[in-house]
Amino acid sequence: MIILGIHSHPGGHNAAASLLINGSLVASVEEERMSRIKGDSAYPAGAVAEVLSLGGLRAQEVDVVAMAGLACDKPQGLLADRVCHVIEHQLAHAASAYYASPFGDDRVGVLTLDGEGDASSGSAWVGARGCLRNVAYLPRHNSIGLLYAAVTRHLGFIAGRHEGKVLGLAAFGSPKPFLSRLAAHPHPGDALKDLCGDLPREDIAAGLQAFAEQQVCAWVQQQMAAMGVSKLALAGDVFANVKLNQRIQALPGVQSLYVHPNMGDGGLASGAAFAVHARLQGGLRPELAPVYLGTRIDRANALQALQKFDVAFEEPVNLAQAVAQLLAQGQVIARADGKMEYGPRALGNRTVMAAAHDPHINQWLNQRLARTEFMPFAPVILQEYASAYFPAWVAGQLAARYMTLTYDASELAKQHIPAAVHVDGTARPQVLGRADNPGYHDILTAYQGLTGIPSVINTSFNMHEEPIVRTAEEAIRTFQRAGLDALVLGPFLVRASAQ
């Protein structure tokens, strides 16, 4: 059965399309990557065309269209006459996490939290034997996501986009003053201006983060006890908060945690498709879904783009060793190769890399990429060394493969990769095994051989307020605009010094 999942509705964000073939997720792309409009909410015609192309299909071959959200747009064009099922917002989030998780036949607690969707701000489900059963919905007026967005806006940032900046800022403040005010007010969002008063914005951010952690962790524990589960699958924008996820993983009774890599509304398209498949087939056994599901950069289209832009390039016999040598020399290198990542995190295929031993590299990168961040850039680390740098990490913690939570850094990490460690002593690593991304792993292995350090900075390959690059042409343009030292484009190496 071929199911096309679509997320698109008026006033929404992160429209997307996903292709499910016989229960397996084979392609997923957000419309912003096609239109180059950050968080694009328009009907995802470009993303629909792209996932069908990636699947080698025509629109007429789609059996069912799965739309996410009760207020969704209708399928357009050649899809207008397809059978269409509409999936409620929180169910789509829950399905995205449950059916893409590695938990198989296990009993799982599936939790969703976001700003709002279809009049609710979260939900709890039991996942068992391939089916989801609802346990609870959270009303809109209790939304942690909306409160976080309101404070983000109050602090002068863009709500729905810059919550990560507030999270980074929180580490510089004292939580107590604002936390006590939030805890004492039954509906803090209604009196936000008065509650914030003249407090420094660092203290406001710190208090907000502490309040969110307290409220969400208490709710998670309550739901785990009610459901009798020790394994959790999470989705929804609130779970983009990596410090919150660290707290959840450390809760008593949490045996295993899976945070959906595309936890925000960009993941609703795949969730809707999963939910419809389970509805029509009487269930769907969860299986860990791939994270590289988008447009592919390969030798052919990389070469075509390089020739179009008249860019000087080389094709090293040992590309990984060549890149590692440049990194060891302090150069900053972008990598655009293979399939684009699914979700907001760069995981090696649309990535900017830099040595993390220089604490000033964050300032350099922020200037070149026109970013303003309060949290340092995240590291990627070879799996076999992860526990030495992040002692709480143990094999099998999937959330760390997708950079969806922070860890307390060891003294070794603070010495070797200070640029990746925040002022509060945490870092958000991508723990990389070779099977996850062989080419990326080879670069890191070669770098470790040269420097003795198994980790580098890994940040997304895009300019500030722009989507991550998708195509080879976009990679060349962004490389040139950012003034980076080198670009890995498929099997080719472009050096700025050679231009």
Segment roles from a protein language model:
Residues S180-P200:
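A mobile "lid/hinge" subdomain adjacent to the ATP/sugar-phosphate binding pocket shared
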Residues G207-L232:
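Phosphate/ATP-binding catalytic cores across multiple sugar-kinase/actin-like superfamilies
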Residues R33-L57, V216:
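N-terminal phosphate-binding loop and adjacent alpha-helix
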Residues E50-I87, A95-A97:
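Short beta-strand-loop/turn "lid" adjacent to the catalytic site in phosphate-handling enzymes
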Residues D198-Q214, G433, N437:
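Short acidic-aromatic active-site loops that bind/stabilize oxyanions
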Residues R58-L70, M227-D237, I333-A334:
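Short glycine-rich phosphate-binding loop at a beta-alpha junction
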Residues G5, H9-E31, S35-K38, L78-L182, ...:
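Flexible beta->alpha loop and helix N-cap segments adjacent to enzyme active/binding sites
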Residues M1-I3:
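Entry/capping segment at the start of metal-dependent catalytic domains
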